[in-house]
């Protein structure tokens, strides 16, 4: 978990500030020079290497995405509690389960916290979320939390202690209806699954060049914002919070388009991607994609 202050973000894009561990239980939780800060919690491999972003106010906190597995959601809960803040709001960026199945753990700890999403995302989850959770829970058992809750449609903006953060309109990435969050106070963007940094991406919903081009267009729009700090939806260990994630995704999607055009079988498609990108974390994502497209 990397803690970034406004001052350090503006002076050194994406650099972690300070090196003081909160305690031995959280060796990756680094204090900032200022309490006006945000931090990023990254899941382990079983949790899909997914990022949750925590914005820290003086007394309260805002969380963007809530993890997938029960162990990672519990670690996230413990990490938030260690900051001394009260979790005020949980915002969900899109309907993929690895970004919201952990809400039950967090709502148990902070029952008064608001759980919200862009109306388009909230509508999708109201329709499909509980069934999706029940199906996965039956297969995964104790690896998932015991309960799930649907977010309410966001109205009136995303705020914390007088600061307002911009929820962008839905964009196309590894799925439709992804809603990044712009944190202008930190010159930062929580890109969710529009950006993977250093890992394979979820390409199951990108079966052709047209869908890859739609994602590339979204990446171009993010790039044009010129934001210094870009928090990916998933990251490899040590991957930065910066535009390197956009570049990684652009390279990956161009390789995917080429491989789709030049291969006929799942094995050949996978081999072409590994040749183009090398071995990356999140191999499960690639395996699912090649079998969905060529299986």
Feature map (PLM): residue ranges:
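Active-site HxH/HxHxD metal-binding segment of metal-dependent hydrolases
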Residues: 85-157
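C-terminal regulatory/interaction regions
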Residues: 10, 14, 265-295
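Divalent-metal (often Zn2+) His-rich catalytic cores of metallo-beta-lactamase-fold enzymes
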Residues: 182, 188, 213-268, 272
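Core dinuclear metal-dependent hydrolase active-site scaffold
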Residues: 155-186
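Conserved beta-strand hairpin/beta-sheet module of binuclear metal-dependent hydrolase folds
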Residues: 33-82, 180-193
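Active-site environment of divalent metal-dependent phosphoester hydrolases
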Residues: 49, 70-71, 95-100, 122-125, ...
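Active-site neighborhood of phospho(di)ester-bond hydrolases with catalytic His/Asp-centered motifs
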Residues: 64-66, 89-96, 116-118, 190-192, ...
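N-terminal export signals
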Residues: 1-3, 8-29
